[in-house]
Curated annotation (Swiss-Prot):
It comes from Chlamydia trachomatis serovar A (strain ATCC VR-571B / DSM 19440 / HAR-13). The gene is mdh. It is an enzyme of class 1 (oxidoreductase). One of its GO terms (molecular function) is L-malate dehydrogenase (NAD+) activity. NAD(+) binds at G12, G13, T14, G15, Q16, I17, A18, N106, Q113, V130, G131, N132. This is Malate dehydrogenase.
Amino acid sequence: MVSQTVSVAVTGGTGQIAYSFLFSLAHGDVFGLDCGIDLRIYDIPGTERALSGVRMELDDGAFPLLQRVQVTTSLHDAFDGIDAAFLIGSVPRGPGVERRDLLKKNGEIFATQGKALNTTAKRDAKIFVVGNPVNTNCWIAMNHAPRLLRKNFHAMLRLDQNRMHSMLSHRAEVPLSAVSQVVVWGNHSAKQVPDFTQALINDRPIAETIADRDWLENIMVPSVQSRGSAVIEARGKSSAASAARALAEAARSIYQPKEGEWFSSGVCSDHNPYGLPEDLIFGFPCRMLATGEYEVIPRLPWDAFIRGKMQISLDEILQEKASVSL
């Protein structure tokens, strides 16, 4: 039985990530099995026929939670009065395409979307950004939507967290459920910081199970950092199904939190407990509070290895920010 209904917008509605994500969303994986969904699916003009096909499949899925499905090429209609937006649509990264090549094109897209959110979305709407370069795109959208709460903008780092989680599980030969406190800091890029020093295996420090520090620093970390490029090289396209799953999990950690769960998210750095510059979107370890708000987990120690990686990632975010104009 539906106890409430949320209004949700998904951009890039005809793309690969959205195609996987929409069915997870409709099933209740994000907001729960008792929450109805008023769904608006947006894509750019010229995609109307493909959008209609997506709607047909959602109708054919007979999802009880879908109260309404609207497909549109109008950002105003998509964002009008929404409680949450999943900004998936962007120019994709292909083989040989670097992040800097995406900044200008996608910056314009997210500036436009931020302005539309500012005009039409609810002030407390939560905004989840997926399109790369995701930290900077999220920052652009946030700064073009000053009416909305800055703390409610999230850049997706959950895919990086999941990649690290899986690698640690395989190396330790334990179930995924035995690995906790998996943390990714900084930028969603090849300069992200997969912080194994915080991780626990069976509630014990990771070093008790994986004692090979060289493997952690020189195999695991660069493998997680470069996994997106490896997927593109192998299949000729960027991650889609795994990204959609990570997006659903990222939002579920906020809307349906597990007690004590840590999750990595790119959030506004204003007033952060680590003394990092303000007005950035930076990946932090977070957890939900009883108030329904998240907090950046404070007072986590950084050893020399992690501190050095943190500075590299911070420098990249600052460089990206400096390269775009609002």
